A protein has these predicted regions:
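Buried hydrophobic packing segments
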Residues: 8, 29-33, 47, 51, ...
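Oxyanion-binding "anion nests"
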Residues: 11-47
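C-terminal helix-coil-helix/basic helical segment that borders enzyme active sites and/or dimer interfaces
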Residues: 12-24, 83-90, 94-101
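Amphipathic alpha-helical interaction segments
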Residues: 24-27, 46-49, 65, 84, ...
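C-terminal charged capping/lid subdomain of soluble metabolic enzymes
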Residues: 82, 92-165
Length: 165
């Protein structure tokens, strides 16, 4: 979460190519790498990998497009973790929110950050509908999938891709 907070502070500056922004993002990426090397990743990365392989979509862009949708999908399996994500993203008053409210606030904050830095909101310009089944099977078979907090299936992953088109 520390890296998420740094990203929120510095990502907008990094997109504008400021030295402080680039330095802050480098630190945030380093801290995030230490975190996910201990706990694994999930279907956000599993779904992003075949987009890079099939369409040459940059991995970070693919992750940013997919993340809010997968956050919504995973929400029932996350306990109170989204409260801390919302706080790290600058959402105030999370202590006075219901679980549903802070989960939505966390997802909305991630979407807003992506929008602010010019990340596309969906996969319409990237994914061909006829490739969805292949993408879903590839994501399901990906080494990152077992780290997802919620069990999933090929059909559910395919539906997540379709919801982004």
């Amino acid at each position: 979460l520390r890296s998420r907070g740094l990203g929120d502070v510095y990502k907008r500056q990094a997109v504008n190519n400021t030295p402080d922004g680039r330095e802050g993002m480098a630190l945030g990426q380093y801290i995030a790498g230490m975190g996910f090397s201990n706990v694994g990743l999930g279907i956000v990365h599993s779904m992003a990998h075949p987009l890079g392989a099939l369409y040459d979509t940059p991995h970070g862009v693919a992750n940013a497009i997919i993340l809010p949708t997968v956050m919504e999908y995973n929400a029932p399996a996350t306990g109170d973790k989204y409260k801390y994500i919302a706080q790290a993203m600058g959402v105030e008053e999370t202590e006075n929110m219901t679980q549903e409210e802070y989960r939505k606030a966390a997802v909305d904050a991630v979407r807003k950050l992506s929008q602010d830095v010019g990340i596309p909101a969906d996969l319409k310009e990237i994914v061909k509908p006829e490739d969805v089944d292949f993408l879903a099977q590839s994501a399901f078979d990906d080494a990152c999938r077992p780290g997802n907090p919620r069990e999933t299936s090929v059909a559910e992953i395919a539906e997540l891709y379709r919801s982004l088109m």
